[in-house]
Amino acid sequence: MGFSAPLSKDQASLLDERSREIFRRIVEGYLDTGEPLGSRSLSRLLPMSLSPASVRNVMSDLEELGLIYSPHISAGRLPTQTGLRFFVDAFMQVGDLPADERANIDRQIGPVAGHEQSLEGLLTEASRMLSGMSRGAGLVLTAKNDVILKHVEFIRLEPTKALAVLVGDHNQVENRIIELPAGISSSQLTEAANFINAHLSGQTLQELRGQFQTQRTELQSELGMLAQDLVERGLAIWAGDNEEGKLGRLIVRGRSNLLEGLAGEEDIDRVRMLFDDLERKENLIEILNLAESGSGVRIFIGSENKLFSLSGSSLIVAPYRDEENRVVGAVGVIGPTRLNYARIVPMVDYTAQIMARLSRKQR
């Protein structure tokens, strides 16, 4: 896709009615078919009477502004990444999700929660639903803080290092190597693990850590200083004080949707790069960071999203939050830049609301 510098507000305000109409038709044609629109086709589509020559003059002006480009000689025009962003910001109208689509989401996700299946089942169904309705890849992930603890163990590896093992409520296992306080004994390792296990009672990492912080005096009376230090180190690592510890569960459904309508080797390479990106844990942690940085649905087009910039993909993502307004996960759709943004944005927003409500019930 063509790339140019961002369009300033002053430049955008210079577009007259026919320029805006021609630009809008080019973008909508691209989002609908992926094909460029030429001057003859545009002259027939426009509500005003303009000759193909007049349309070409307007297209030339739009090209100078960096809003459209020609993919090859004698072809029609396609929107640049800057053009798509301008369209999303200035033209796109996002309304409420239609009642039938809300009902469809409720029908697909609701029964999973109603039958008290695992949170894993809820995540899977939400991802599958987003994929099916958007024709992109549906993505649902959770932050590590949302994992409910079942068992904790510390296994000494070296005098100054131990393997910290966490088992979640769905038997998912996380291993982390942690630095041990100097001089801590094997019995103190066991004491620290037993203390955590005795206080779990179905709490998340963040809840357990908060409890320990508010009951520091009681903690000091029950544990020695070294064991207390170890407990706090283990919880800090698991609860995501470092970036690696932030990601909990990830489910992506609908990768096959991204293979539909590929036109050539370049498109195949683009999708292959996207698949590779989805396997990198650091990229998925960044998705959580992107979701946390905004209060609602966020749209990242092409290289605006450094995660998937090489594959020329767009990401529409929204966080979902717990009762204390902490981000505990994100839902989204990944696909080509010609996603139906106006339709997918309210879909992702509504799904995030549903996930926030249902995930609390799963706790």
UniProtKB/Swiss-Prot annotation:
Gene name of the record: hrcA
MF terms from GO for this chain are: DNA binding
Q: What is the lineage of its organism?
A: Bacteria, Pseudomonadati, Pseudomonadota, Alphaproteobacteria, Hyphomicrobiales
Q: Which UniProt keywords apply?
A: Repressor, Stress response, Transcription, Transcription regulation
Q: Which Gene3D superfamilies match?
A: 3.30.450.40, Heat-inducible transcription repressor hrca homolog, domain 3, Winged helix-like DNA-binding domain superfamily/Winged helix DNA-binding domain
Q: Name one GO biological process term.
A: negative regulation of DNA-templated transcription
Hydrolase as a keyword?
no
Q: What is this protein called?
A: Heat-inducible transcription repressor HrcA
Entries under NCBIfam families matching the protein: hrcA
What HAMAP family has UniProt attached to this entry? Answer: HrcA (MF_00081)
Q: Which family does it belong to?
A: Belongs to the HrcA family.
